[in-house]
Amino acid sequence: MSLNRISAAEAASLIKHGYNIGLSGFTPAGTAKAVTAELAKIAEAEHAKGKPFQVGIFTGASTGESCDGVLSRAKAIRYRAPYTTNSDFRKAVNNGEIAYNDIHLSQMAQEVRYGFMGKVNVAIIEACEVTPGGKIYLTAAGGISPTICRLADQIIVELNSAHSKSGMGMHDVYEPLDPPYRREIPIYKPSDRIGLPYVQVDPKKIIGVVETNWPDEARSFAAADPLTDKIGQNVADFLAADMKRGIIPSTFLPLQSGVGNIANAVLGALGRDKTIPPFEMYTEVIQNSVIGLIREGRIKFGSACSLTVTNDCLEGIYNDMDFFRDKLVLRPSEISNSPEIIRRLGVISINTAIEVDLYGNVNSTHIGGTKMMNGIGGSGDFTRNAYISIFTCPSVAKEGKISAIVPMVSHHDHTEHDVNIVITEQGVADLRGKSPKERAQAIIENCAHPDYKELLWDYLKLAGNRAQTPHAIQAALGMHAELAKSGDMKNTNWAEYAK
């Protein structure tokens, strides 16, 4: 059957107030752009007439300016899940304007399938090719596309010529069965393929194909600096030492690395350390640094959910697919982030913390315990199931006025039971096999900034010793309270809490 070509505005007009929309993509890579931008215009026009217009948004992870940005400013989002990075969306969430469900990325597709979030009315899927028989070839990300395509009543395809058809075949599309029929996911090494290179849909559900030429709205990250370079080197030195001790096999293990300049610095340091053999990635996001290391032969294979790279880097991949075809695979997020596979492969996870407390609990989502930053993303998927779980962060922020090492985190995302290693520019705290009191000593000695060490030791004295996990409950968030009061955690006075 022939597919109906329509404009982005025509496609957006088919979406009604109250609909739930499923979107392709994972980060700005591979996400819808043209239709959501037109949908924001409709919302603004309806609001100007005094009429309501809001939709629910289901995605694989964050999107880009032409989705989360424009829709947030148009006040067109009623509900959204999961992770996001857009500043306008963040502002709306923290103002209480959007209901935001910050769940683990590996759970998103299955929770939609289980019916936890309601019906999917329309799926908007970016593709580099779509056939009359309903084969949709995704662009730079897998996300939750297989699930939302199957569940949606209707599908709109954004056929984006900014993505070369040479990328066809990069995806490995696999959707597990739901309980009680689910079987093991048969991936035993990062390069295994178990599915199809396309998403198969009923072509009768495709109500329109929108032709676009719209590059991904990828973010670039700050270049490495002495601080991030030191953190990266500390990570590389730690992993090399663990390999020398025989804790990590001599062949090394697959890595997962988060997003951002610290993650890039870590990968750069690992690439330079020739005591670490060429390795594989089983991760959620591939950034420019990974592509560079693949070209250099330092990374043998990269399995991920998305190619979150700059547009010139992506063009280079498309132009060199003969080289990359057997070195990259893109998967749906419930496979790239599958706890089952992460544990089977022995993935080493490296993620970024906002703050870490003395016992190894990590806050990776909330500023001051209440204001959402971005979300938990896939860090929980990997941390709890990793062979070794690592969290990195600078020891201080805001010109030293904020310590990343605190007595008690203001929001818990990753518990002390899941965090193995904490690394700052100051050093490495190995928490494996340690009691809470031993963990506190390791974190203060090795990770805290010198300006805060005495303050943290004094807190432990105030907390006393007659407990499994010592805390002075009345003072546990004292450094956060002082930051709110004076703007500098260093001004904390424990004597105020000892009365």
Q: Which functions belong to the PLM regions below?
A:
Residues 1-499:
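Conserved alpha/beta enzyme-core scaffold
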